[in-house]
Amino acid sequence: MKNIVLGGGCFWCVEAVFERLKGVINTEVGYSGGKPNPSYESVCNGDGNIEVVKINYDEKQISLLEILTLFFKIHDPTSIDKQGGDIGIQYRSIIFYENEEDKILAQNFIEEQQKIFSKKIVTKISRLQTYYKAENYHQHYFINNPDQGYCQAVIAPKLQKIQSD
């Protein structure tokens, strides 16, 4: 089993896509990249942390390349600190890796993707230093709150788009 930690906008949206994926064992939303011991409130108030999803996956069933390809389909890697209506540094596009092999793969992936994108890809690649699990009410948010307004307006259409691709 391997882990990759991704930030690409609201962590509810990113998790909703990856928790349904064959080969993904578990997902967990959290915070990384800022001050220690963050809370949702401190993140929203600019403590430097990014909303992220830790993806635990079986590399015999799904590759990191497949995960990154989907990641680039579900968010805009050319947008600085913004995804749709969600604006702030906590929505930064970032790949947190745990080993050099994954770092190199991510760098090569972005280099190849840049040939496709007309705008500059701003997705950062950084070694995972700290990770803090988000509050329990954020975990598997879409599964637990499918009728909530944000889920219906933002997450459900994103899932429908991915399923039709």
Swiss-Prot record:
Transmembrane feature ranges: none
Catalytic activity entry: L-methionyl-[protein] + [thioredoxin]-disulfide + H2O = L-methionyl-(S)-S-oxide-[protein] + [thioredoxin]-dithiol; [thioredoxin]-disulfide + L-methionine + H2O = L-methionine (S)-S-oxide + [thioredoxin]-dithiol
Pfam family, one: PMSR
Keywords, alphabetical: Oxidoreductase
Gene3D superfamilies named among the record's database cross-references: Peptide methionine sulphoxide reductase MsrA
SUPFAM superfamilies, per the entry: Peptide methionine sulfoxide reductase
Enzyme Commission designation: 1.8.4.11
Residues the record marks as active site: C10
Class of the enzyme per the UniProt entry, highest EC level: oxidoreductase
Gene Ontology terms for molecular function: L-methionine:thioredoxin-disulfide S-oxidoreductase activity; peptide-methionine (S)-S-oxide reductase activity
Similarity-based family: Belongs to the MsrA Met sulfoxide reductase family.
Xref: HAMAP family: MsrA
General function of this protein: Has an important function as a repair enzyme for proteins that have been inactivated by oxidation. Catalyzes the reversible oxidation-reduction of methionine sulfoxide in proteins to methionine.
Name the record gives this protein: Peptide methionine sulfoxide reductase MsrA
